[in-house]
Amino acid sequence: MGAVLAEVAERLHDNFPYFHPLYAGQMLKPPHPVARAAYALATWVNPNNHALDGGRASSALEKEAVALIATMFGWHTHLGHLTSSGTIANLEALWVAGKLHPGKTILASEMAHYTHERISGVLQLPFEKVPADAQGHMDMAALEARLAAGDVGTVVVTMGTTGFGAVDPLPAVLRLKEKYGFRLHADAAYGGYFGLATNLGPEAADAFVHLGEVDSIVIDPHKHGLQPYGCGCVLFDDPAVGALYRHDSPYTYFSSAELHLGEISLECSRAGASAVALWATMRLLPLWPGGEFAQGLEASRRAALAFAQRLGEDDRWEVLCEPELDIVCWAPKSKPELSQAIFDEAARMDLHLALIQVHGRLWLRSVLMKPEHEGWLEDILIRLDRAYVLAAARHF
């Protein structure tokens, strides 16, 4: 076994240093040590949270953990559970939406994650994109024009887009909901925890204040919740939607008169270890404004603001938009074709960035989701400067 594990360790060297602040590319945040330890501990039991028969302790911990997340959104009654990913969580939310509004169109911003269009196809529900403004927000005039045309069952707002970290104008969408009566789902997979931060801009802060007024929410603890990958969460404000899950099969579990997690989820087998890890993390780092967990989010936000400011003060760079959370997109101002070359040069200096295509132009992108990024900004900027100089010299 030792030889095999040594081989595994060697193979795992073929990775980017996701844990390090110089990895400033995609949405990868190291799990907290308590999450890793609790997850590893639970794997010795290997619980399956599909039913109480498969994971009594981990099922109880999941319910407690999900209730804490619901409370963060101001929900004291809810229906919800963990999932293996944000994609599955969104699938479940849109499945419920489709059951309540069969055949009706689902709308989401053109900047929303592509999974919504894909999921709608799987569910055989019509899907349409709503144009976004220059800041990446859903365009309210375009949304209302489409709503006025009728046949819309559900609108998806994104609380932190994958590309920009843009927060859709939820208060304005809620006003349209009162007028047109559609179901409202919030994809807060990335940004959901930022309601705890005290240093958001006024529009984003106001959107998070109203997040508890939607019908369903998806949040990914495996992004900003310090969890190992494989931990999403879906929440519904009305527990009555549980009736939509009713089924009978020879495999039905009869271990409790109370609805168990397998009876309110589309997924069957799910790792109970994810619930154990999440519960332990929130036990150590409660979801409190001003607490240690919230302070980590605020540090990431400060890092993004400072990074965008420094880039904006440099005549060589153009910042795509003011960051609303902790994602910054920028490009060479006079030489936009250099983005790929700068990306490559930065990687050679162990600064790992990401790329995003917006309106036919390639932009550099950084997700500054580690609190440590704030203390590493100078090092990041020095390497970025060198990458620019080398890229410009080699291509011109």
Language-model-detected regions and their locations in the chain:
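Short loop-beta-helix segment that forms the pyridoxal 5′-phosphate
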Residues: 69-92
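Short beta-strand
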Residues: 82, 318-323, 354-358
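Conserved PLP-binding catalytic core of the aspartate aminotransferase-like
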Residues: 316-345
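Glycine- and acidic
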Residues: 46-53, 76-81, 127-130, 152-159, ...
